[in-house]
From Swiss-Prot:
Bias-annotated ranges (Polar residues): 1039-1052
All ranges on the Extracellular side of the membrane: 20-643
Listed Low complexity bias regions: 1023-1036, 1172-1184
Intracellular or extracellular location(s): Membrane
Protein name stated in the entry: Receptor tyrosine-protein kinase erbB-3
Assembly behavior: Monomer and homodimer. Heterodimer with each of the other ERBB receptors (Potential). Interacts with CSPG5, PA2G4, GRB7, MYOC and MUC1. Found in a ternary complex with NRG1 and ITGAV:ITGB3 or ITGA6:ITGB4.
Cytoplasmic side: 663-1339
EC number: 2.7.10.1
Keyword DNA repair in record: no
Function, in words: Tyrosine-protein kinase that plays an essential role as cell surface receptor for neuregulins. Binds to neuregulin-1 (NRG1) and is activated by it; ligand-binding increases phosphorylation on tyrosine residues and promotes its association with the p85 subunit of phosphatidylinositol 3-kinase. May also be activated by CSPG5. Involved in the regulation of myeloid cell differentiation.
Catalytic activity: L-tyrosyl-[protein] + ATP = O-phospho-L-tyrosyl-[protein] + ADP + H(+)
Main location: membrane
Record-stated family: Belongs to the protein kinase superfamily. Tyr protein kinase family. EGF receptor subfamily.
Amino acid sequence: MRATGTLQVLCFLLSLARGSEMGNSQAVCPGTLNGLSVTGDADNQYQTLYKLYEKCEVVMGNLEIVLTGHNADLSFLQWIREVTGYVLVAMNEFSVLPLPNLRVVRGTQVYDGKFAIFVMLNYNTNSSHALRQLKFTQLTEILSGGVYIEKNDKLCHMDTIDWRDIVRVRGAEIVVKNNGANCPPCHEVCKGRCWGPGPDDCQILTKTICAPQCNGRCFGPNPNQCCHDECAGGCSGPQDTDCFACRRFNDSGACVPRCPEPLVYNKLTFQLEPNPHTKYQYGGVCVASCPHNFVVDQTFCVRACPPDKMEVDKHGLKMCEPCGGLCPKACEGTGSGSRYQTVDSSNIDGFVNCTKILGNLDFLITGLNVDPWHKIPALDPEKLNVFRTVREITGYLNIQSWPPHMHNFSVFSNLTTIGGRSLYNRGFSLLIMKNLNVTSLGFRSLKEISAGRVYISANQQLCYHHSLNWTRLLRGPSEERLDIKYDRPLGECLAEGKVCDPLCSSGGCWGPGPGQCLSCRNYSREGVCVTHCNFLQGEPREFVHEAQCFSCHPECLPMEGTSTCNGSGSDACARCAHFRDGPHCVNSCPHGILGAKGPIYKYPDAQNECRPCHENCTQGCNGPELQDCLGQAEVLMSKPHLVIAVTVGLAVILMILGGSFLYWRGRRIQNKRAMRRYLERGESIEPLDPSEKANKVLARIFKETELRKLKVLGSGVFGTVHKGIWIPEGESIKIPVCIKVIEDKSGRQSFQAVTDHMLAVGSLDHAHIVRLLGLCPGSSLQLVTQYLPLGSLLDHVKQHRETLGPQLLLNWGVQIAKGMYYLEEHSMVHRDLALRNVMLKSPSQVQVADFGVADLLPPDDKQLLHSEAKTPIKWMALESIHFGKYTHQSDVWSYGVTVWELMTFGAEPYAGLRLAEIPDLLEKGERLAQPQICTIDVYMVMVKCWMIDENIRPTFKELANEFTRMARDPPRYLVIKRASGPGTPPAAEPSVLTTKELQEAELEPELDLDLDLEAEEEGLATSLGSALSLPTGTLTRPRGSQSLLSPSSGYMPMNQSSLGEACLDSAVLGGREQFSRPISLHPIPRGRPASESSEGHVTGSEAELQEKVSVCRSRSRSRSPRPRGDSAYHSQRHSLLTPVTPLSPPGLEEEDGNGYVMPDTHLRGASSSREGTLSSVGLSSVLGTEEEDEDEEYEYMNRKRRGSPPRPPRPGSLEELGYEYMDVGSDLSASLGSTQSCPLHPMAIVPSAGTTPDEDYEYMNRRRGAGGAGGDYAAMGACPAAEQGYEEMRAFQGPGHHAPHVRYARLKTLRSLEATDSAFDNPDYWHSRLFPKANAQRT
């Protein structure tokens, strides 16, 4: 039985050891400090206990269980392992207190001043309910305090407990009496020591059974079974990590006497330096950082800083630091916006210890004297000294009354700044007036008056202020900021000797004496001017810095005849007063100071230099040898061999650990530097071959062994993208990269050789392209780029569409254009530009990826088939789809689709269409629909990217220009409407950039772009003159039922044939032309103000609506006319940059739903032939006029004059439908009637004086006045003249010249052409132009 009991105890101890190892993460809960006081009945007390201690392991405080009923279930207390204060159990009726895991009661707080456990009166005199058992089966340690258990009538076995084995303090009081009498005996395995009658209730002895060699607790009776000195409550082994609980602190499972200090002694620098492994004391645990609601005070986690310290944020750590005087305190001032109008006796106490006044300070007569109206007594003048702590006033200082016995304002002697954020009356920040007894100002520390004026007046005794150089105090211009008058005359002040001290400089002074100088002539000491510093004599010795005298360090020895120090530190002394430790003078040599490897001990030699003791000295020494150690000489001499062996072993271990640590840290630093060197382009990588040094290509050629693929990120038409790591040869670092594997699908070619194109791709380096780190040739080509964890821009806009704003979208458009322009400069065609191939380097910076990949493939692999699922047909230009022709202008087409994706937040282009249908739709003029957020300005930029003729598409340089211009005013071009409500998150919109920031950040210097758009607008306004006039009507909103087409497929027709059918006949009613409601191609959102369209903020539906109104006449005129010559209209005319194309005579062309003119090749009469070339989609131009003073009506894309004759009725059939010229107010002469038979010739464009020949774009509706021959657009006639090929045609009809007999040519729509005419391989298609060319040659 005895052996069985011993085995059970050992098993129990092992289970405790495992629990201690797993218990590093403890549930901590607060204790209470109520004593015997309770609130409510027994049920209420039980609920309070349950809320406090459910699943609690460590009670930070006291565990108080008082007045709990007999039916209370206290099983939730079983998890408590430690109580830092005391345990109080009183006046309860439950039978068992279940604390089976309680091991340690620390007793940091004791009950009644001396007891850590207090158990009393736990029974009910009127019933049999009482406490019968304390189940403290694992309690083995009470670190402080005694035990009191008395008057518990039914409580048993308390007298069997050996409390001396539990209580650590020898003299602690233990009172156990008057408890249960008729108790069952302990179980026989417990040997008379138990907490209850069962075999599991035995007391665990950890001190009285120990061998004499043990200083504390033990885990067995043998001498080698002693616990570590820092253990509490027992242990499972001799190490400090084997403790059941820690006596002082638990540092990551090890019991230590103190947590790692924040400062350690460095033997090399002889200084205390920050310890990188410091930890802080949080209760009984060492933590690397305090909880978020605690602050660090030295090495402790505290709830609040002590009064003489202030809380500061240092490197993200909240710490308590000494204030160095008075701790900062901000107080509310007086005056406007404050609760008080003046300083008075009712609020003077609120300024105690204030260092900063938030607002103003007013001293009025109602505040210093009795205020009978508000019943405020007079102010005690002595209380004005509370303002001696004030250093800053953010508002103004107004002193209009002052106590008679105070002759200056010395209570503000520490005031340094008057902010002037709020000013008094006429802009005064310092106002002093009508103080009859004041002789000097006394603002000896005032250095700055940030804003406002100075007013000093009617102070009859005031002197000294005449000498002040106010320009040193006033920030900014000081002219007219001083108003000083009606004070004591300067002559009287000089006669009485009220002048500045001779030690003051020419800057003047605030009053008499050397302490009132604005600046000193020689030196100053603590604000007082002096003739010299104590360099060679006087106490203390001083040194000078910026004309100020500072004391030497106290450990410096005063020298005679020479300087004592040259700085304030202990290392700046010429000689030391006591001892020198390295370069520093110290009061004593280090004795037990904690170093990186343990305590440091030193001794002073004959020259008072501190020398290190022998490494085996643990209590100091008198010399360098082992026998010079203090306190251990006899022990060490008695066991010399053992000491040497232990010393050598420890030294070797320390050397190994230290070397391992240094090696690990060095490798870590080396890896960081290597990664920076490999990833940053700034450091050129040395080529493998010296012959390559002349080649500036920075592409690295990888080996197969350097790259490891981790997972597949995606696949495309050119290959598969993997996430991987790059391990440079000879390095141990792992750099995350993206690896794109390109394989020859035919299997006939490998990528063993490194071509010039591969090196050219690797040499590209720009902020808005994904940089190629290198490539790995082989059977498949592997392109390695830096891994961008944010992913593609396509996924980003889909996920964050609710938070993206117009500024960010336009900025991204600029950056993509800049990246593509850089590729264009380096002759690199992308071929696969799409939003999925634009990566996010940061939320505000994008980079173009996957450029130049197609050129790495063999010719067979470059043939893209329509049937291939991954072929990017929807992003390709027509010439690329049909002929495999890839140029920078085909990339422009893809850029337009990419911008469309961006503006639709990642919508799929041509959704719902098969790939084989897309080329036919594009040939017919169909294009993607206008995104809802885009105004017509942005959409027209996209449309120009999708022109059939690649030569008239904009370049990336021009696209960067255009988007940069729009990025200056994002809400003008992108209108994003989101539902507002309490749950709607605000959009994370970046701030709008200024013009200078856009010039520096968005456009590179090499673009050489003209960013002075304001000057262009002014020039445009000047050239327009009075041509812009008020419209006679505005657009009306169509009803939803009027919509003809809702583009569900994500595209819109460029040539809407039904537009002509929707146009109704016009009639002249009452001399005024009436317009009907136009029919829209898209549903228009309701609730949108019509005025937005005139400000440049229109949706796609509204833009089409506005354009078609200029074609279709209606029967009603708008009620609210609005000028069209506003800023949005001019902005649109600037943004719609059109290619220079020939013009057609009036009556031969008609705009489609997007404002594009679709002329036929041949003019058609009654029997004209339709055979000929197709006309490509183009933009209409507007002819000039000589009559500038007439009223015209403008629309975005067209203009229409009031009073034009009615049109002939429209034909009913589509075949009979003709195109009608939009400017119907032409001067129709007799020659115009014959224009139907005249061939058309291209217009000659005469550049104006303000333009350059290489200007690629002109504005859409730019009006010219008389003398338009020298303008941007040349006038054109109906028929060519013999001498010049054309004659001038008047664009506007003169008064009284009507030609109602003129017939308009009927042209067939593009949609109705035969398949042979629209086939893409038809050469006529590619030789077509926006306007027919008479001398075009067929090829």
